[in-house]
Amino acid sequence: MRQEIHPKYTEVTVTCSCGNTFVTRSTAGKKEMNIDICSECHPFYTGKQRIVDTAGRVDKFKKRFGGMKKYN
């Protein structure tokens, strides 16, 4: 393999918005990384159904279409 063509692979501390912190390796070039959701709080891994809305999309949808009548 040719030397010095690959990015550096360093340890990164990842912090989730739920408070979970773990260390992994990455080529991102940062020592710390913040994420919105991880395996500790994601509904698929926890088995709990909840709405994950980080940008207010659900509230925006309900505001826009919440007053509509249901048609059968």
From Swiss-Prot:
Q: Look up keyword ATP-binding and say if it applies.
A: no
Q: What is this protein called?
A: Large ribosomal subunit protein bL31
Quote the record's binding site residues for Zn(2+). Answer: 16, 18, 38, 41
Q: Which InterPro entries match?
A: Ribosomal_bL28/bL31-like_sf, Ribosomal_bL31, Ribosomal_bL31_A, Ribosomal_bL31_sf
Self-association state and partner proteins as the record states: Part of the 50S ribosomal subunit.
Tell me a GO cellular component. ribosome
Q: Which Pfam families would you find in this protein's record? A: Ribosomal_L31
SUPFAM superfamilies reported in the protein's UniProt record: L28p-like
Supply the PANTHER family for this chain: 50S RIBOSOMAL PROTEIN L31, CHLOROPLASTIC, LARGE RIBOSOMAL SUBUNIT PROTEIN BL31A
Write down the PROSITE patterns for this protein, in alphabetical order. RIBOSOMAL_L31
- Provide the GO biological process annotations: translation
